[in-house]
Every structure is written in C-alpha cells, then in structure tokens.
Amino acid sequence: MEVQLGLGRVYPRPPSKTFRGAFQNLFQSVREVIQNPGPRHPEAASAAPPGARLQQQQLQQQETSPRRQQQQQQQPSEDGSPQVQSRGPTGYLALDEKQQPSQQQSAPECHPESGCTPEPGAASAASKGLQQQPPAPPDEDDSAAPSTLSLLGPTFPGLSSCSTDLKDILSEAGTMQLLQQQQQQQQQQEAVSEGNSSGRAREATGAPISSKDSYLGGSSTISDSAKELCKAVSVSMGLGVEALEHLSPGEQLRGDCMYAPLLTGPPSVRPTPCAPLAECKGSLLDDGPGKSNEETAEYSPFKAGYTKGLDSESLGCSSGGEAGGSGTLELPSALSLYKSGALDDVAAYPSRDYYNFPLALAGPPPPPPPPHPHARIKLENPLDYGSAWAAAAAQCRYGDLASLHGGGAPGPGSGSPSATSSSSWHTLFTAEESQLYGPCGGGGGGSAGEAGAVAPYGYTRPPQGLAGQEGDLAIPDIWYPGGVVSRVPYPSPSCVKSEMGPWMESYSGPYGDMRLEPTRDHVLPIDYYFPPQKTCLICGDEASGCHYGALTCGSCKVFFKRAAEGKQKYLCASRNDCTIDKFRRKNCPSCRLRKCYEAGMTLGARKLKKLGNLKLQEEGEASSATSPTEEPAQKLTVSHIEGYECQPIFLNVLEAIEPGVVCAGHDNNQPDSFAALLSSLNELGERQLVHVVKWAKALPGFRNLHVDDQMAVIQYSWMGLMVFAMGWRSFTNVNSRMLYFAPDLVFNEYRMHKSRMYSQCVRMRHLSQEFGWLQITPQEFLCMKALLLFSIIPVDGLKNQKFFDELRMNYIKELDRIIACKRKNPTSCSRRFYQLTKLLDSVQPIARELHQFTFDLLIKSHMVSVDFPEMMAEIISVQVPKILSGKVKPIYFHTQ
C-alpha cells in the first residue's frame, strides 16, 4: 500500500485515491467526478425534500459510532447560529459549503432522540434562512485526518463550489497543524480582549469549543500565515490569487475557482462546480484575473487558436437552483480570461493588428454573444480584418495585399474581373520559390487586358501565361554584356517588392528622400511610415528644430557651430565609438562631432538654403522677363551653386565616417616567417572587415538597400576596398615604396618574397604608385572608395536591383561633380573622369588574384600553420568560390 507524505505525519490513503504526480491527481479526480458524480455533491443533498433529509439524518446518527459522534460537534457561525462540521466518506475534512437560503425550514432541525436542544442563537439563524448541513456517513475512522482546507473556506470562497473529490486532493496531511498552537494562543487572547457575543453564548450554554473555533478564534478571518498557505495552495493548483489580495472576504470573490463558476448570477444560470476539463485547461493558459481588455487583446489570436478545437463543444454548466430548478449558460470556447464586472465598459481593440498577421478570413467574424450581466468572464472578440485590413496590408512587403481590405477596391479573389486573371498570384508569396520578386503593388481592380500596366516602379506585369514563370526577365548575361556597363539596362521582372523594412532608415543628406519616389502609390499617408522625428539625431534629447541641416537640440547646435568653426582638433581617447546620449554627450567631443557630420550637419546648410531661395527668385524673374539679359542671369545663378557645391554635404559625411588606423597586432621582434606574416594579415583583415561594415552602414543611402543586398555587397567587395585603402595609406605614409598594411605591419621587398605572394604585392604597389602619378585628392579617394563598394554584384542580380542601380549612379554623379568642381573645361573633366574610372577598374583584377590566393591558402592552412579567424574563414569558404566560379562579377567602366 502506498502512503502520502504530508506536512504533519504519515497517514494512509484510500486505495482508490492513490495517484502518482500532481497534475495526474488533479485531472484524474476531476475526470472521476464528472463521470461518477455520486451523492457527494452538495446539490444532491440540498435538492432532497426536508422529510427525506430528516430520515437520512436519523439513519446516519444511529449508525454513527460513539467516538464518531464526539467528533461531530456543532460550531456556531459568525452570527451565533450553529453549524455542523461533517466529514466526507473518504475520511477527510470537507470544505465548508455556502448554505443556500431556504424558505422551507424555519427552525434548526434536530432529532428528538438525540436530546439536543437548540442554542440561543439558533432562532436568529433560523429567521435568516440558514440551515444545517447533515453529516455524511463515514466509511472508516478518520480521526487522524487533517483539517486543512476546511479552514480556508472563508478566505477562498471560490473553492466552496468545487467537488468533494477535488477537496480531498487539496486536503493534504496536517498542513495547518503546524500553526494550530500559535493560532490557539492568539484566539485565547482575542477571546479575552474582545469578548464577542458568540463566545459569551458558548460560555452560557456550556457548549464545547470545536477545533475550528479554537483555530479561527470564532471569526471567519485567518492569520497571515494561513493566507500565505492559501496562496501557495492556489498557485500549486494554477489558480489566480491576485484578485484575492485587494478584495475583502465579504465581497464574495466567486468565479476565481479553478473552474470559474458564475456564482454571482441568478440561480437559473449558476453552473455546477464540475466544469468541463477543457474549460479548466483553457483557464490555466490565461495570465490571471487582473488583466485589462486592452492588454489581453494582443494575445487573443493565440488563445483563440488554442481553443479552436473546442468550438463545437458547449462549455456551459447546469446546476440546481434554490427550489430545485436548473439553468444552463452557454459560453464560447475562447472565454477563458476572467475580469471583474467593473471592467466590462472598457472597450477592447478588436481591429488592432499588433503583429501584422496577414490572416485570410473567409468571411466576417461572427458577433460575440452578449455577456451575462453578472458574468465575470471576459468576452474575447475575434480580430476584425474589415476596415483595418488596409493598414495591415500597407505594411506588408507586397503591394497586392492592399487590394484585400474592405475599402471598396476590388482585388483578386473578391469577385471582381481581376480575380480570374490574378488567381495564380498568391497574396503573400510568389508562384515559384526561385522568383526574385513578389507581386507588384498595383491597383486591385485590374483585368486581364491590363496585365501590362505600369507598376509603381516602372515595371510591367506579365500576362497570365507568364504569371508563374520568370516573365520577361532578361538573361543575366545581358545585364552586363562583356563585363562593361555604362548604365545598367533595367530588366522588366514580372513583379517587384515594395520594400519598406526597418533597414530603410531615413537620412538627412542629399539621398535621404531617394526612396520617396513620386510614382510610388501609398495606401496610407507618408507620415504613417515615417512619423516626424521629435528627438535630436545626435544625443537623443528633445529636438528644438532643424539646425545646420539636421534635426538637433540646442546644445548640439551650439556645439557643432563652435567645433566646426574652431581650429581645435579633437581626438578620441577610446576607439572612436563612444556613446553619445543626453547624459554623456560632453564626454567625447570627437565622437560627438563625428556623429554631427554623420547626421548631415554642415556650416553651409544655411547658405545653401539662402542660395536655393535666391535661385528660385532669379528663375522666377528670368521667366517673367523678356530682356536679352535672361541667359547671363541663369549662368550666374548656376555658377554660384556650382561654386558652393565644391564642398558638399556628401564629402563632409565621407570624411566623418572614414575608418581610423587599424593595427594588425604583429610582433616585429620575432623573425619574419611565412606563417607569422600571413596569420597577421588574416587577423588584420578581420579587424578591418569590422570597420568596413560600420563604414558601409553609415554611407548615405546604403540602408535603402534590402538587408540581404547589404550583406552581399559587403561580402563581395571587402577585398577590393581593403586593397584600395591600403594603396592610399602606402601613398600617403611611405610614398608607395612599401606596402603599408598597418603601422605594425609594413611589407618591404624581403617580406614580399617571404610571404610567397610577391606578384600580388607588386601589383598592389603599382596601384599605390598610381595615386601619386594621377595626383589623387583626398576627396576623389573618398568618393572612389565609396563607389568601389557598389562595383561587384551577382550575375543573377540582387533582390532590390533598382535601388542598387540608382545608388550606384548617384555616387558616379558625385564623383563627376567633385571632378568638375575645380575644372571649368569640359574636356579636362572628361579626361579626369576617364583616368579615375580606369584606376577603379584596375582594382578588380588585383582583388581576384588575392581571392584565389586566400582560398588556396585556406584549403591548406592546416599544413602551413596559418591561422584564419572565424569570420574570415566563413567568408572565404562561402563567398569567394562564387566570385571565382563567375557567379559574381565586377562591374567595369571600360572594356577589359
């Protein structure tokens, strides 16, 4: 026989109540009660007529042993009325049940043979309609049974409606007996000090004081220790106890029981304590009774999904009323979150779509049933995707979702003529996984004849026959014929994404509005996607306005004016990555000034605004005048603008974000060896790669690209960028006599031979000498380096090829503007542009040779003891083979 270990002592369990596991105890007992209700329910006893109850009581008293009769003592209630404390047939103390008001019994029933006389408080109890609970016939002697949860009735009234089997499970051995002596002392002190009426009545009648009286002190309240135990029992059973803390016992907080019976309603709608198990499980998933409608509306899809399989089941319960009647309350399966009746007037937000889930609903959601006036269960309304679906569709990547909302625009699948022609286009995904783009965001009401209509980006939609194919997408080899490109011919893909992801961050420079083309159709106003900024772009403090070309606060405005106009050079004491916020903006002036430049601040912003106004004014005067001085006036205006643009904001940003000097960590005291030199080069490459990523993310317009395109462009162009930057350092530091990889790693002729890459080093030194021969200026170097980032792409194209092409062309225009800044002769500008573009083309063959060298070195690195950092090894092993196999090719300006 198995035994249960309680807090008090070891006591035997009935054989039928032996379980293994806490949750198995709970659900198996509940299942047994549902299947075999038995006569243990208090309703079964209360529904019997008074005569039958009297006969049953007489029979029970005759069969009760003398020792058992001594244990069944009468206990006065708070108002002095006697109550009988009985034990259930399983040998455990039962919970005190709430006595139903009865009009059929006017006096306390007492068997004439027992010789009991009614106490003085009995008459008052009878007048109030209270009745005694008859004792249940015992199965065995249970004098050692614990009196645990029978003491918790006044504090946890919700448990009073639970079944007897559930009470048996909750009645563990001697849980409250540890505190019984302390409570008895407290009760004695309270009895002496207070001298309540119930105590005087017991002393007058000489009635013995029951164990419950001695524990509770004749009142319905319990100590803090008992409350803590009550909370522990409730938490172990998955019950919400938050509501018990702020409500007094007199408020009768019903419905917080595990099965949530609606005891606050009229008797006709009160369910039985034995609610279905599905409702019990559903209630355990909720957060508790203290949640508001607005908070729980966010998680309604998840709760509705859990109870989806229970939609066909009725979760209502029936019970007997006061006069033996019964009623049924039907509740939907999603009604599992409790709330008080005071919160019923709080409006939920059924149309709010927090997670932008594109759920396709077959029809409008059914209206929820009206809540019961006394019900304490929150009615969860399904998500309403009617009028609010337009806002959700506008945030999706694919424009065709905008036609799904109920705003009056027909779309595919809505019964319009376009439903047939667009049936092969899924609303969320393309027909084939290999397609690069999704459905373009045109109007929802097109027909089959409008398949070639112009999309927002100028792309055309293919006819129905090509809907599931690549459309008229050009062959990748035709994009860059012969590896030469002047202006990339745009293909006409079947569809294009309308990317509006978080990577498309706004930039206040000249390319900040690049993504806001006037041809793009927005479902909602542009302010919906880009809310007006109200914080300083430098420190995050409250912005006072647009100062020097950026939205900043007054402090950063004054700092930039003084720092930009002053002659003082700021140096960062750290690694040029200090945190600049409201509280630490004064710690590092160097990083603060760099962040100002990154935000687009410049001293000429005010002058540019004045010149722009002057230009508009002069153009207006020139258009209205008919004098022969019209042409000279226009030339004068252009000359003023071009003269100012010799120092554009673009160059200020490039100068501010240029990475600093990176050391390789090479030990020059050790003798040079192949493994040591190459390991130091690999370590330097990984360190520089981190700076390249930060530099690229700060470039104007770079984040307008798709996030996958950003990663691809950096992984393909990192070698060319490092070679180009190393050539510039060699030119400026050692006059191109040696290769200046890092201050602690400079390659001379000996190291070039020792590294076994002499031919590659010679070509890199020749590139460095080109900077001196062509007299490259720092402004030209910065722009060429930025353009080199956008000079190699996959043959199949990027995910957002149009943005990439526009960004590359804008950088080419910036380079041409820098060239034309100091040259007035167009022929000289063209010659200079030719020289610089030829220099850019010469970087690609060098980078390809280095790609081949590093890939071969990685394969045999374990043989030559050369260390490869993890990030470098991953890029070389994954991305470099694509370049060597021809899947990724550079973009040349001239024929090779």
Swiss-Prot record:
DNA-binding region: 535-608
Region (Interaction with KAT7): 601-895
Protein's name in the database: Androgen receptor
This protein's domain notes: Composed of three domains: a modulating N-terminal domain, a DNA-binding domain and a C-terminal ligand-binding domain. In the presence of bound steroid the ligand-binding domain interacts with the N-terminal modulating domain, and thereby activates AR transcription factor activity. Agonist binding is required for dimerization and binding to target DNA. The transcription factor activity of the complex formed by ligand-activated AR and DNA is modulated by interactions with coactivator and corepressor proteins.
Organism: Sus scrofa
Gene: AR
Subunit note: Binds DNA as a homodimer. Part of a ternary complex containing AR, EFCAB6/DJBP and PARK7. Interacts with HIPK3 and NR0B2 in the presence of androgen. The ligand binding domain interacts with KAT7/HBO1 in the presence of dihydrotestosterone. Interacts with EFCAB6/DJBP, PQBP1, RANBP9, RBAK, SPDEF, SRA1, TGFB1I1 and RREB1. Interacts with ZMIZ1/ZIMP10 and ZMIZ2/ZMIP7 which both enhance its transactivation activity. Interacts with SLC30A9 and RAD54L2/ARIP4. Interacts with MACROD1 (via macro domain).
Similarity comment: family membership: Belongs to the nuclear hormone receptor family. NR3 subfamily.
Residue span, NR LBD domain: 645-876
Amino acids binding 17beta-hydroxy-5alpha-androstan-3-one: 682, 729, 854
Region annotated Interaction with LPXN, chain positions: 528-895
Role of this protein: Steroid hormone receptors are ligand-activated transcription factors that regulate eukaryotic gene expression and affect cellular proliferation and differentiation in target tissues. Transcription factor activity is modulated by bound coactivator and corepressor proteins like ZBTB7A that recruits NCOR1 and NCOR2 to the androgen response elements/ARE on target genes, negatively regulating androgen receptor signaling and androgen-induced cell proliferation. Transcription activation is also down-regulated by NR0B2. Activated, but not phosphorylated, by HIPK3 and ZIPK/DAPK3.
Record-linked Pfam families: Androgen_recep (PF02166), Hormone_recep (PF00104), zf-C4 (PF00105)
Comp. bias regions, Low complexity: 54-78, 178-189
Top-level taxon of origin: Eukaryota
